């Protein structure tokens, strides 16, 4: 559950 929150911000910050 905590990894999903980080994954949502990771893709948005990558591009």
From Swiss-Prot:
Tissue: Expressed by the venom gland.
Subcellular location: Secreted
A cellular-component GO term for this protein: extracellular region
Record keywords: Secreted
Primary location class: secreted
Domain of life, per lineage: Eukaryota
Family note: Belongs to the bradykinin-related peptide family.
Protein name, entry field: Beta-campsomerin
Organism in which the protein naturally occurs: Campsomeriella annulata (Wasp)
